[in-house]
Amino acid sequence: MFAGVRAIAVAAAMVSVSCAAVAQVVPPSDQPGRERERFERPAVPLAQPGGPAIAVPGVEAPPGAKETKLILRRVKIVGSTVYADSQFADLYADLIGRTVTLQAIYDLAGRITAKYGADGYVLSRALVPPQQLDPNGAVVTLQVVEGYIEKVEWPPQLSSYVDFFSDYAARITAERPANIRTIERYLLLAGDLPGLKFKNSIKPHPTKVGAAILVVEVTVKPVDLFGRVDNRGTNARGPNQFMTSTTANNWLHIHDALTVTYAGAFKTQQLTYWGATYRQVLTSEGLTAFVNASYGFGRPGTAELELLEYRTKSQYLETGLSYPVIRARERNLNISGLWFWSDDRSSFFDLPDTPPSTLDKMRGFRVRVDADAADPSGGINQLYFVLSHGFQGFGSTQNGNELASRAFGRVDFTKTELTLSRMQPLGGGVSVLGAAYWQHAITPLLVSEQCGYGGRVFGRAFDPSAFVGDTCVELLGELRLDIPHEFKWVSQIQLYGYADHGWLHNIAPVPGTLRNVDAASLGAGLRLGWLNSLSVDLSFAQAVQGYGLTGTQPVPGQVVAANPIRRFFFIITGKL
């Protein structure tokens, strides 16, 4: 009886409270739309530091070349279609009119070969053909052989797939002389096709001078499996949570992939999440169509929220096109455009149409730029930029909607996001990772579009999206040490320490909610890997500033740190 009276009283109170009060009762991480970030896998840079270059056999000088001397009057270079004669002049200008050795002539041929190689023409070389040279004044002729790919040999099992491979071969063989950038682009585009992985080699043509044959081998992987278990959830939805996904690669032989994801809290009534991704490569140049959809629902499980019968449901759909403007081993640039649709709902006491229950329906577009580059020092840089704009219409809720997740949040929003990172090896197994995230909005945002601090990347000592804001700056620094070992089945033993910091700002906060947040954390951990299939991340984290610390009281305008709390996290990931 008393419980029933209490529930009625609480319900009556909740109907009359403001959005500010709801924001304090329901943490941002447990509001609809925020659960998606838990199950999004961060983009991995495609760029890799340059490997060993393709090299053509050098031209060895004959015995006695270092002792044979001549006066060099002029150099004549024949067979070059890439460069004008004047572009070679700097390579031998200091030799003209001087007494030089025959070895110097062969060294000049090597410099010409190196010039071709530096510009990507790795199959081309300069030769010293047989000729009569006057020791008292010689005109030396150098013959350039500009190498090219005469033929690409693809495995016969590719004949059952949509034929992009003839296009790749045509692009590669049409270029004379062959440039490694062209060869690399089309082999990498082939390797981006779902479920197909390639190895290649080059062999000389049996009859044609300067010609080569590109031989390609393929490995087909029809299914990818992924699983993760961790304790990075929240008290209301976790903290133990899981994620599984299965990808069907190219089953229709039309260069498509379908991924189905099932995830949630261990107590699935608190949070259940379904996701699906379909993508298809439409052209041999890598133009790709994609559709991503997700559906999450649950009843967060703290005593307070259970008493209020708080429930959430969120749906998200996006569809668009992406195109690899640059696809190379050491640098990549991909541009995407998409339309998105979202429907995020929460309810108290099964009263979805009565405040403080919430309803956000958003429609809009995003433009994404994803770039990465590796440099000669071994560092890998990554850039991720997103421009998002929402529309009022097309089925969205209206601005000023009494059920909006934030009183002044707008559906016709505009925001930009930028993520930068660099991983730099320092030698001796030591490396450092630096990352920064920035979001800027010009109007107040609804909850699902706000930036969050807290989770696996930034704010690691905090729950996912422990803080949210319209505008954010977040920084991360991580020092790593790879431990050498002799275990063949161990792919990684790595110690690391990190520190991160976040500054968040809310535009037009309602009374009782935070305008500015300043939070930070630090920690250390151990990463282990087995056979590149299983990895374990164990870490201790300490929140050194921000809400979430024992004794902290959130007040408008600031967050004051008290006694720091320490947390232990684990992440176990497997893939096949």
Kindly give the residue locations of the regions a language model identified:
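Periplasmic polypeptide-binding modules associated with outer-membrane biogenesis and secretion
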Residues: Q24-G233, A263-T272, A276, T416, ...
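Repeated loop/turn-to-beta-strand initiation elements of outer-membrane beta-barrel proteins
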Residues: F198, V223-L225, L252-L258, S284-F290, ...
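Transmembrane beta-barrel strands of outer-membrane/channel proteins
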Residues: I202, G227-N231, T244, L258-G264, ...
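Residues that define the transmembrane beta-barrel architecture of outer-membrane proteins
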Residues: G210, G238-F242, Q270-W274, K313-L317, ...
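Outer-membrane beta-barrel "beta-signal"
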Residues: T246, L528, V560-L576
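Residue-level signature of outer-membrane beta-barrel architecture
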Residues: A248-N250, Q280-L282, Y323-V325, A371-D375, ...
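Transmembrane beta-barrel wall of Gram-negative outer-membrane proteins
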Residues: Q269-A373
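C-terminal outer-membrane beta-barrel translocator/porin domains of Gram-negative envelope proteins
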Residues: R345-T513, L549-A561, I572-K575
